[in-house]
Amino acid sequence: VQDSKRKEEILRKEGDMSYDVYAEVCKKTLEDDFTFQSFKLNPDYTYELEHTPFESAVNALQFLRENYLDELKKINWNIIRANDTCVYAMTHSFKKQLSDIIESEDENQFMFSPTTIYYLWTAFNVINKIKSSNDIDTKNGCSIVEIGCGYGGQCFMIHTVAQFYEVNIKSYSLIDIFYANKLQE
């Protein structure tokens, strides 16, 4: 309810001020450690990023299971989880979807943000498109440009999956508003 009220506030003003609000959150995140640690929970940030619904992540995992089950069993889930543990994130248990993939009794091993799961889904799709393309030299390296990348979570996930598949990424350009780009540093 609080998030929807904040969205109405942002959009009710003259024009769409969402980028101004988002830029201000990114700027404050760079200036203060507490704000940095919790920026993924800030409604003014999650209006733009980190707002993947749980149901979308469940659907993404279902697709990944149907298409990449063997790979999911081999990938290092601690690296995937790092996207949610370097700063606070709204995580959910995906134990029901991952209990036959991640071998653990520890409930924390199944905790991921829906956005991280969605980034993983996107990364598998991107890297497999690159691998199957006859126009891209995956051994000598490919170049990727991401526009609207926020703190760089998708970039992190694409690099993780690329390493798993031994796809060489020669360059990865991240383009966003000034303060969002500074978050990546």
Report the location of each language-model feature.
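Intrinsically disordered, low-structural-confidence terminal and linker regions
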Residues: 1-5
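Conserved Class I S-adenosyl-L-methionine-dependent methyltransferase catalytic core
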Residues: 14-16, 21-135
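P-loop NTPase catalytic core of nucleic-acid-dependent motor ATPases
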Residues: 122, 141, 158
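Conserved class I S-adenosyl-L-methionine
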Residues: 140-150
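Conserved SAM-binding loop of SAM-dependent methyltransferases across substrates and taxa
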Residues: 152-166
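Conserved SAM-binding motif I beta-strand of class I
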Residues: 171-177
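Short alpha-helix immediately C-terminal to the canonical SAM-binding loop
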Residues: 181-182
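S-adenosyl-L-methionine
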Residues: 185
